[in-house]
Amino acid sequence: MLLPSDVARLVLGYLQQEKLSSTCRSFILESPNLREYAEHYTDEGSIPGCVLSLFGKNLTTILNEYIAMKAKENKEEIPVMVSALWKKLDHTLSQIRSMQNCLVLPTSQKVRTRYGIQDLRHQRMLTSHAASTGSAVALQQTSTPIAAKQVMLRSFTSQSASQTIVSPLCSGQSTIQCTNSPATESKGETLQNSALSDAEKKQTSSPMRRKTDCQRRRRAAPLNSSSATHEGETEGNVDSLQDLIDGNFPQLVIENAREKILSNKSLQEKLAENINKFLGSDTATQASKLSEGGALEQYTSIDEILGLQGGEMHMSEEAIHDILEQTELDPDFQELYDLFACSSTKPTKLASRDPSLQTEGVATTSIHVANDNLEPMESSFDASVDTSHSSNHSEVGAAQKKDGRSQLVVPSPTPKVTESTGMPSKVQEMPISASERQSMSDRSVESKKSIDSVIILDNTGSDTVIESNEEVQVTSMEVGISQSQDVDMNVLHTEVIGADCQLAVEQGSLNMLTVDLTVPNLKEETPKMQTYEKASEAKKSSPLKDEVQALGSRRLERNKSEGAEGPCTTESQNIVVLVSIGSTVTESNLLNQRGDLPATPRKTDTSTETTVSEQMQAESSITSKELKVLQKQASKTPPHPMVPPISPSIKGSSSDSDGSSLPLEVSSSVGVSTPVNTSNVEQNCSDVSSVDPSQIITLSFITEDIAEDAELTKAVKSISERSNSALLLSPFHKPQESSSIVSIPGPTSETLTLLADPREVVNVSGDVATGVKPAEDCTIISLPGASNLSTDGGIIQLMPATSSSFAPSGSFFISTCNTGGAQQSNIMVVPSNCAPASTQKQPCHFQTPPRPHSVYTVGQAISPKLSQGSTFILASAVQPVLPGVMGMFPVSVVGQSSNTFTTPSHQVLHVPVSQGVPKLSLPPKSQKPVPPRTLASAAEKQGTAATTDSGNRKSSSRMQRSENVDKNLAAMSQNKPEERQTSTTNPSTKGTENHKRVLCFENTAANRGTPNTKSLCNSAAPQNKDKVETMNTSSSSLPAKQNNKDSGKADKTAPSTEANSKCESVPSKQPVVPATKDLSGDKKPVAVASSPDVLGGVMANKENMLQKENKKQELPEVSKKSSTADGAAGNLERTVQAVHETGRKHATLPSILRRTKLSTERMCPPSPLTKQASDLLQSMQFNSPNAKHFSGGDLPIPRTPGSGIDDRLVDSHQDHMKTPKSKRYPEDGGTPKPMLPPATPELPACSPASETGSENSVNMAAHTLMILSRATLAKTDGSSPLKDNTQQIKLSKNSSKKRKLDEPDEYGRRPHKKELMSPSAILKRKKMKKHRKKSTDDFPAGMDVDKFLMSLHYDE
């Protein structure tokens, strides 16, 4: 609602803007709506606080906007017409330019096609590069005779006749030109035939293929949308090119399509939906566009025709293409597309289109296509061949797709065609492509019935497009050879369908990639085609050699019709190869697309790929030679072709020249045979044939985005280019097996196993399982560390397109053999899970190939210095621990202080699952990694045995870690890595890991770090927990008491403990007193533990039943004191125990626990609880002075900020733990409480769970770590500090006795847990911390705050 005052203010604002001050003044005075302003306006007429605008717009702006709106309403529509005319002019000029490319513009489509084919052939002979790029286009142009007109549509891209305008999109198109080109070759014509016009291809292709074609077209020069119409016209219409130029489309087709759309409301709605999706334009115009677009062929012309007719030229080409794409995908529009196909093309076109479009009707369509194609082929062999080939190809692809084999079945239809054609096997293979396709379409109807489903799948997927690309290239490249190749390929393909479901699926995924790649891969297409031809030859030679010789063309035919079933193993293997070859181009495209290694796919992915890039240049010029050579090679290495089938990407493998490259088995994990040695290839072939489908792991990298990932592509390229290693899914572990599969043994051994799921261990071959023992919760990526590997394996992680930047669980790791291994790093830390350690359910094993260097330096801000192109350390799911490390090397591995860490040359990284403490769990317990600081230090001190325990303690006691980290960390971490490695490697370690010590109260056994602790010794566990609590509550007292108690407990527990205590000189001496303490402490700690108040989380002992409140209180005090003593000592003790236990072996650990349990139980049972409590109290009193002195007197004790306060805390804590007496409760109630809460809150902070939370938790954790570290420092200062501590303890015992006695009572009264957990407790703790900071005793002399902070940081 606009009020008059608003208008007045707007006007006033305008007057002020125009600086009409006098008018402003008079206006303000006279306007009834501005009376409130009259008193406030200044001489200039401005009002200080007044906003003279409406919704932020002043009068001028509002008026201008209004004018603009009005002007728009009155605007005439001339611009639309003008733009349409300009577009038409532009289109016409582009067509003229494309026609100029043709030497002659024959009036007859057939003549034009012939010229185009000849021109293409000529061009290919002349320039390899031009041939690769241009001929691909030309190939596409070459279409079935019907498609000849379509060529005109491709005016932009055609290098040969304007018809060959088909751009890289052609490759994407469903018609597989390659097969056609073979037919063309048989005729002596070039691949040009294979290049079908967009319309034709679309007709022959399934909606999916058409979609991919559209995308490709978009990428390429705008395709003529009229191509479809031209196809329709091809029957009797004028040249499609001329039609395009004249703008004469088959009016009947367009009208029919329009009528259909208009008569079907659902179609209209869907069209409108699709159009509105991309831009809200008139439905009618869009519908008309779609009707024409229905024949996706009218790309460039869509705008002209539709724009001129409908006057809707304002839609961008992109939008129209998008809409068309959307429409293509809609089955409801199938009829429309069929309309265009039928009316515009002869039955051949319709048939070909139907198979591609209608997956189910592939067989029938194939037959129709075959018949129809035969006619056009006869009339114009080149065009007809191409057309039939493309249509058949699409059919085949469709059939394949039906099977769900998204393999490139295109080749198989060709063989079928060969069969019907009855041409010689070799001739049948390629030359028959056109006729073969036709006969094949008939044949394919029969044999396709088995393969039809497979073919249909291809059509549905992008596979068809891939096929067409491959074929297009192949045809031009393999003139003579391609014939036989195609036949074999078809046969093989048929076989493959029957035998290699996985392969087919892989191919399908590859095909998907190929679709995207087709446009960009046009350049690669020719090489790929060449590769394809080579592969075909190899297949041809091997299957033809064996089969043709044995079965002859009849067998080839039978394979086509029945061979799909896999008439013979060799054949089926070869078929696989052929199929893979068929998809080889596709695969290489896929790889390129995928960004696996655009270059690598050629070299590494498949020999074909290598052949592609190498052959692209050499082959284009020497296509015939190379084809022949390839054939020879193929004959030499018949098994080799089989290998390619296993891995479509290996298609190139058929050419031995690529022998050096180990084809990546991307699509099929069956075996990749590198054509290094012909004999090897043959062996591989046999191996492949023997390979069990179950062993085939299908790694389908269908990441369309990967191709666009420049970095990944680069990395893959660099790795693969160095030396191609095969990705062997099944025999990655067994070098021999992989060598059998892969001709190159070295790369094979180094072959990285791709794990489709990082968590899954690929047991493709039984050897694999033996090679790497998957941890219970581990994923193993094993790079067979064969000594024969001269270079390190580079690991590439292919990540499926996901939102997460870190490696997803489904990511694939590709390992390649890199030369210059001397610089490569040995470390491959690849956590299988992206989830943080806490969620990490499965540890991972990573085995790295042996590497020359074992020492790695970690730069401050730089990632570890790895030789470039060596190992890709993929970021683990866990965020990088060290900023400079890129998350590859956890701090635990690298260590806090040192920039370098050593790793064994060949090692298995065991990434344990940290069940207890998420944060503590080190990403991977890599053998190299330095053990967690505290664990490392303690465990290292203890000995290798500690490693096992360290795993347990790791999670259980971060606090210990922080304590030990400072001094122990540096020395121990260095030593420990080895220990840890051993522990990690050992299965026992796993068990230990499962039983990690957690500071959490819930885990009784966690502290002990022994799996049995929880169940075996409740008493021991309570003590441990008490220790932990004590550590948290009174860190200051902990060090001294811990040492005492640890030594005592260690002595009690076992000689091993004694040895540990001996390691700690002080503890060994102290043990005598602590022993008594421990006896009493243990007795009552058990009770304490059982008492819910004290331990809460700890459950369970016989003592629990016996607990009385007094006893409970006493026990808590005693236990807490003992735990404090044990707490600090607990760390040492744990370390000692861990070391000791490890030394004793896992078997020993349980016994130690039992001993502890027994000792505690013995202690408890001998005397009544009350008696125990009194004893404990007495012992506590004796010890408490020590503890007090220790805490107060010993600087090392972190928690003694104020000797008085700390002592109280320590005393109260200890008393509380040991035996708070009801008498003392009232006395100590006041002071101890405040002290304890601070200490207690620290406990939660220490626990990983609490730390995970907020900044508060981090701060708390930091404080606890600091305190613990101080305690550790006190302990670790050396034996002397410990001794001093003992002395101090004695001194402090006397002084602290009273305080402790008082405090224990208070503590006993008040539930420690509540206080610890309560916010007030936290506040108290903070206050206590402040007090501690104030006190000089607080920081031990030797303490390095930074170090502790750093360690703290790491833990967090």
From Swiss-Prot:
GO terms for molecular function: transcription coregulator activity. Required for progression through the G1 and S phases of the cell cycle and for S phase entry. Activates transcription of the histone H2A, histone H2B, histone H3 and histone H4 genes. It comes from Xenopus laevis (African clawed frog). This is Protein NPAT. Residues 3-35 form the LisH domain. Pfam families: NPAT_C (PF15712). The LisH domain is required for the activation of histone gene transcription. PANTHER family: PROTEIN NPAT. Belongs to the NPAT family. It is found in: Nucleus.
